[in-house]
């Protein structure tokens, strides 16, 4: 008869624990504390594949998000309302990639939680803050795109950038508030296998023996960080679709071309935000479902099998990968960002094309000419400068 091993209650990223080593012991058939040796345990090839995958996620994610942030701060034309939110999203992804992903990678070789009680609280707080920033930012972005599509010709106020920065800061504060209980109640708990007389330390948001708390925690995480925000986003995008379906351009002929371009630009950005939302939903769904499954079908012991381990690794990797795919989705969807991304990636400054007259600020437009002087053949130069506080064509929605 095969020996039954304990199964840690949390085998998902949503509760950042050292449960992978206990789940690895669940797929092992040996009696050693590590849980990595035995007929059913992952071999060196599997470990190498796991660490290569994590290394790719971390390096590619840091590179992509760092370039996105650099493009935003170095390129004046990219400092627009939607790009402020997207840059805030990149900061949240970088935070996760620099802290939680490397910590999670240590679980596959370590026997217990390595970072102590303080590390447990801090990392739990960072992890949930990053997830909150991502989903709440996407929700606000969807609301912003709905307003832009419904009122495509409305000029933004002069303080729009400042107000958007304040909104982005508010999202971070709200995410931290939601993550605060996680930091307060997270602790290092002992998980024991009576058959092997071995104990493991696990960073959890609740005592391992409290099944009801586990069920409540998994449901709250699923609702607050997935179902509710995505439901709000779905409502906004259904309204956007209805508006676009019913819309007719009842505008004067001389303004037709400019209005169409502005509307098409805002529709294109709405599509970009929708792709980012879809990527978030796809990457995080397996993680949430797996956490719910383990919370409501908890068993103290599980038969040794590679399947739980593989499914757990897949859900973690997919969730982490969401933090590195956004810059490349923007590269695919936005020619403007693609140009700046290539310039930064190749370490050279892209040549800036001569801006067309329609994009030239009127407060910087100078007209020069030569006219003959009165009563003589002498030719004089004249220079006329136009002063205005607006531009001929706005770029507030460039992505």
From Swiss-Prot:
One of its GO terms (cellular component) is neuronal cell body. InterPro entries: Bombesin_rcpt_3 (IPR001560), Bombsn_rcpt-like (IPR001556), GPCR_Rhodpsn (IPR000276), GPCR_Rhodpsn_7TM (IPR017452). A lipid is attached at residue 347 (S-palmitoyl cysteine). The keyword Transmembrane applies. Coiled coil: none annotated. GO terms for molecular function: bombesin receptor activity; neuropeptide receptor activity. Keywords: Cell membrane, Disulfide bond, G-protein coupled receptor, Glycoprotein, Lipoprotein, Membrane, Palmitate, Receptor, Transducer, Transmembrane, Transmembrane helix. Its main location: membrane. It is a multi-pass membrane protein. SMART domains: 7TM_GPCR_Srsx (SM01381). GO terms for biological process: G protein-coupled receptor signaling pathway. Disulfide bonds join 120-203. Residues 64-82, 144-163, 242-272, 334-399 are cytoplasmic. It is found in: Cell membrane. Residues 1-41, 104-121, 185-220, 294-313 are extracellular. The keyword Manganese does not apply. The chain crosses the membrane at residues 42-63, 83-103, 122-143, 164-184, 221-241, 273-293, 314-333. Glycans are attached at residues 10, 18, 29. Interacts with C6orf89. Belongs to the G-protein coupled receptor 1 family. Role in sperm cell division, maturation, or function. This receptor mediates its action by association with G proteins that activate a phosphatidylinositol-calcium second messenger system. This is Bombesin receptor subtype-3.
């Amino acid at each position: 008869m095969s020996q039954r091993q304990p199964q840690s209650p949390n085998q998902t990223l949503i509760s950042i624990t050292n449960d992978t080593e206990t789940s690895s012991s669940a797929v092992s058939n040996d009696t050693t504390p590590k849980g990595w040796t035995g007929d059913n345990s992952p071999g060196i090839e599997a470990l190498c594949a796991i660490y290569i995958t994590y290394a790719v996620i971390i390096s590619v994610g840091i590179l992509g998000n760092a370039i996105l942030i650099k493009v935003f701060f170095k390129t004046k034309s990219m400092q627009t309302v939607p790009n402020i939110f997207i840059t805030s999203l990149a900061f949240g992804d970088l935070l996760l990639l620099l802290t939680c992903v490397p910590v999670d990678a240590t679980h596959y070789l370590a026997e217990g939680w390595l970072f102590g009680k303080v590390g447990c609280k801090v990392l739990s707080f960072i992890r949930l803050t990053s997830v909150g920033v991502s989903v709440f930012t996407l929700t606000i972005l969807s609301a912003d795109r709905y307003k832009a599509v419904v009122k495509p010709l409305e000029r933004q106020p002069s303080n729009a950038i400042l107000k958007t920065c304040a909104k982005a800061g508010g999202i971070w504060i709200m995410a931290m508030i939601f993550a605060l209980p996680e930091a307060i109640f997270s602790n290092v708990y002992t998980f024991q296998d009576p058959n092997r007389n071995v104990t493991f330390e696990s960073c959890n948001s609740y005592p391992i023996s409290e099944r009801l708390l586990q069920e409540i925690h998994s449901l709250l995480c699923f609702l607050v960080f997935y179902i509710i925000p995505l439901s709000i986003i779905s409502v906004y995008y259904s309204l956007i679709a209805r508006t676009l379906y019913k819309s007719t351009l009842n505008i004067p002929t001389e303004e037709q071309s400019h209005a169409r371009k502005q509307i098409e630009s805002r529709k294109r950005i709405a599509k970009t935000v929708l792709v980012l939302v879809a990527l978030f939903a796809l990457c995080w769904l397996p993680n949430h479902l797996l956490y719910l499954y383990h919370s409501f079908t908890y068993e103290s012991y599980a038969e040794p099998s590679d399947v739980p381990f593989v499914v757990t690794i897949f859900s973690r990797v997919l969730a982490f990968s969401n933090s590195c795919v956004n810059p490349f989705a923007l590269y695919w969807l936005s020619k403007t960002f693609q140009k700046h991304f290539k310039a930064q990636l190749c370490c050279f400054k892209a040549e800036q094309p001569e801006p067309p007259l329609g994009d030239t600020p009127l407060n910087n437009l100078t007209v020069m000419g030569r006219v003959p002087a009165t009563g003589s053949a002498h030719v004089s130069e004249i220079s006329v400068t136009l002063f205005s506080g607006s531009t001929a064509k706005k770029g507030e929605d460039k992505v």
